[in-house]
């Protein structure tokens, strides 16, 4: 199981939100590239980035910070937030991203996800953000009546690289991930599922791995708070 350290970008800074609330942002650093280097130096294999402003704006906002990170490290990087058309997808991949995450458009323009996955094999992930089993979009500001598993099934044959499942109510709350829901999703689809939201301890990581079906886990606040030691966690998961 791959551990993805997360850098959430708001106004050019590294932040963490509580349950997706932009007003409840805690700034953990003002130099995203330095944070990326710190994660690399601790042994990270991947990096997970979110353009929070972009998720609300519907277009890239923290491009300068993302580009600084890409210039600072040579790890594969995945990015979500405000990526809603083919030109933006192509632009980010051209700039060196290993993978782009499509969330809102997976609900609103599923054919774009299919087209992108066909054009860029292995480089497109679907981000499914949910509250109470229902999908939320546009920076989690809009809730839909779309069921998580139903949405995931729509992309099983599309060739997407992964599904990143975020339980919004757990995100940034340090309350533990929704292991049951994540495992159920992973067992329901034939696409690798990455857990996000609430991963707050080594025990959480081990419990996710123990399911045998979850491909990865994303953690942000727990790494910044020191609740998880990245180097020790990577060794334990190796």
Swiss-Prot record:
Its EC number is 5.3.1.16. Its main location: cytoplasm. Pathway: Amino-acid biosynthesis; L-histidine biosynthesis; L-histidine from 5-phospho-alpha-D-ribose 1-diphosphate: step 4/9. Pfam families: His_biosynth (PF00977). It is found in: Cytoplasm. GO terms for cellular component: cytoplasm. Keywords: Amino-acid biosynthesis, Cytoplasm, Histidine biosynthesis, Isomerase. The active site is at residues 8, 129. It catalyses: 1-(5-phospho-beta-D-ribosyl)-5-[(5-phospho-beta-D-ribosylamino)methylideneamino]imidazole-4-carboxamide = 5-[(5-phospho-1-deoxy-D-ribulos-1-ylimino)methylamino]-1-(5-phospho-beta-D-ribosyl)imidazole-4-carboxamide. GO terms for molecular function: 1-(5-phosphoribosyl)-5-[(5-phosphoribosylamino)methylideneamino]imidazole-4-carboxamide isomerase activity. GO terms for biological process: L-histidine biosynthetic process; L-tryptophan biosynthetic process. The keyword Isomerase applies. Signal peptide: none annotated. Belongs to the HisA/HisF family. This is 1-(5-phosphoribosyl)-5-[(5-phosphoribosylamino)methylideneamino] imidazole-4-carboxamide isomerase. The gene is hisA.
């Amino acid at each position: 199981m791959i551990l993805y350290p997360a850098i959430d970008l708001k106004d050019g800074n590294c932040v963490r939100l509580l349950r997706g609330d932009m007003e409840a942002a805690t700034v953990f650093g003002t130099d995203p590239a330095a944070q990326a280097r710190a994660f690399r130096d601790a042994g990270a294999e991947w990096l997970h980035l979110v353009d929070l402003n972009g998720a609300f704006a519907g277009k890239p906002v923290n491009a300068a910070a993302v580009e600084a990170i890409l210039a600072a490290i040579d790890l594969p990087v995945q990015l979500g937030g405000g990526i809603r058309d083919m030109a933006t997808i192509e632009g980010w991949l051209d700039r060196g991203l290993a993978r782009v995450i499509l969330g809102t458009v997976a609900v609103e323009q599923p054919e774009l996800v299919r087209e992108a996955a066909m054009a860029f094999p292995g480089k497109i992930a679907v981000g499914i953000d949910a509250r109470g089993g229902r999908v939320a979009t546009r920076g989690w500001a809009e809730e839909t009546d779309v069921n998580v598993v139903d949405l995931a099934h729509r992309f099983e044959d599309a060739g997407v690289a992964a599904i990143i499942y975020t339980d919004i109510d757990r995100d940034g709350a340090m309350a533990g991930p929704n292991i049951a829901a994540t495992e159920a999703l992973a067992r329901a689809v034939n696409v690798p599922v990455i857990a996000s939201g609430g991963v707050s301890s080594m025990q959480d990581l081990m419990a996710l791995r123990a399911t045998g079906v979850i491909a990865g886990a994303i953690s942000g606040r727990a790494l910044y708070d020191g609740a998880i030691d990245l180097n020790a966690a990577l060794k334990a998961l190796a």
